[in-house]
Every structure is written in structure tokens, then in C-alpha cells.
Regions:
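Conserved beta-strand-loop-alpha-helix hinge in the C-terminal portion
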Residues: 212-234
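ABC family nucleotide-binding domain
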Residues: 1-202, 208
Length: 234
């Protein structure tokens, strides 16, 4: 709520985010779009507690993250937030199964085995669990990353251009899995993307421009997204 992020001072001041207020509904898939420099990634980093806000508040699972000490914020990120990045960030010496369970192992948490198996089945990795990242294709590695984000049953998943390093067929496959995670597992996902086709997998799109919310679109199609971006001068 009322989130601002300011870099620099005086004449060199840059408002990356300017009094942004937005809510993300539980069990829904939301995309954040906007031109380069509009504040998309900054908003995501502030929401996930990866970057400090200059002003405002962020609440995840009824917890105001600005009030947390570093140790508690780390614990919240580990237990309540899942991350999917453009680069897969898998541990090369661990196999797929170990990579998926890594957030749980770090938190000394066995996790819900039934849930983990459901996640593995949802992203179709049953026959790849003993493979290390070097033995997996890019799409399979990103599926492991999506499963890792889901493994701890987080309150929310933040995905930053998750298909940016993948060809369009593989990218659409990953987005289908993310859509399934929302529809079948009740997951909440917020994704930053610049691609109208990727955004059309979401239930809702929030558009940013110059650090402010410029509009929203519900039940988007790629054509609607393109039209809307033209109107906003993206």
C-alpha cells in the first residue's frame, strides 16, 4: 500500500515507484506489465522483501514485512514466498528432487510429502528426479525451478520473466504449468513480463508506467493486451 521507491537525492532523485497501491488476490495469477524502466521489477523486489521501500507497506500472509528484522524477513521469504527467475538458479551438484526440496531442507522442514508429489506430477518431472541440472533441458530446469518455488506451499510466488531464456514452445509449457498450479493447487502467482502472450495466461494484468499504476485488464487475451499497451503508449 502506498509504496514508493526513490533512488538518489535532490536533482538526481529518481522515483522508481510513486505511491503504488495494489492487492493480489489469493489463488489468482496476476501479471505485471509495463515498458522498460516502468518499475515492474522494483515493485516485485519491494513486495518480496528483496529491496527496501522508501515509503509504504507490504503485507504478505497478514504480516507487514517492513516491521520484520532481517532474520525474520529471511524466514518469511523461505517459508511463505516462492521465487522463479529468468535464470534457473539450480544447484548443479544436486539432482532435480534435491533441488525441489532445497527450501525445505534449509528450513529443517520435511514438508508435506503428498503436496510435493502433487507438485512433481503437475510439472511432469516424475522421470527426471535423479537427473542433475546439466542432464536436463532448459525447459526441464525451469520446471524444476517452478516445482522448487511450489514445494513449501508458499503464500505467494513471484516470477520475474520466468520464460525469458526459453523458446516460445517451452515457455508456453512453463506458463501452462504455472496456470495449473493456480487452478489445481490454489497457488497465488505474481509474474513480471513484457510479453503479451505470457501475460494472457494470467487472470489479471496490472500495467505500470513511470512508477505508477496505469491500468488493469481482466481475463486478458494477447490481442487485448497489445491494444491496451498501444493505448498506454508502451
Amino acid at each position: 500500500t502506498n509504496v514508493s521507491k526513490i533512488y538518489g537525492h535532490g536533482d538526481s532523485e529518481v522515483r522508481a515507484l510513486d505511491d503504488v497501491s495494489v492487492q493480489f488476490e489469493t489463488g489468482k495469477f496476476t501479471a505485471i506489465m509495463g515498458p522498460s524502466g516502468s518499475g515492474k521489477s522494483t515493485l516485485m523486489h519491494c513486495m518480496a522483501g528483496l529491496d527496501e521501500m522508501t515509503e509504504g507497506s507490504v503485507t504478505i500472509a497478514d504480516i507487514d514485512i517492513a516491521s520484520l528484522k532481517d532474520k525474520d524477513l529471511t524466514k518469511l521469504r523461505r517459508d511463505k514466498i516462492g521465487f522463479v527467475f529468468q535464470s534457473f538458479n539450480l544447484v548443479p551438484t544436486l539432482n532435480a528432487d534435491e533441488n525441489i526440496r532445497l527450501p525445505l531442507l534449509l528450513g529443517n522442514n520435511k514438508g508435506n510429502e503428498e503436496w510435493i508429489q502433487k507438485v512433481i506430477n503437475t510439472v511432469h518431472l516424475q522421470d527426471r528426479l535423479t537427473h542433475r541440472p546439466s542432464e536436463l533441458s532448459g525447459g526441464q530446469q525451469q520446471r524444476v525451478a517452478v516445482a522448487r518455488a511450489l514445494a513449501s506451499e508458499p503464500a505467494i510466488i513471484f516470477a520475474d520473466e520466468p520464460t525469458g531464456n526459453l523458446d516460445s514452445t517451452t515457455g508456453n509449457e512453463i506458463l501452462t504449468f504455472m496456470r495449473k498450479a493456480v487452478d489445481e493447487l490454489g497457488q497465488t502467482i505474481v509474474m513480471v513480463t513484457h510479453d503479451p502472450v505470457s501475460a494472457s495466461y494470467a487472470d489479471r494484468i496490472v500495467f505500470l508506467k513511470d512508477g505508477k499504476i496505469a491500468g488493469e485488464l481482466l481475463e486478458p487475451t494477447p490481442e487485448l493486451v497489445l491494444d491496451y499497451m498501444k493505448k498506454l503508449g508502451h
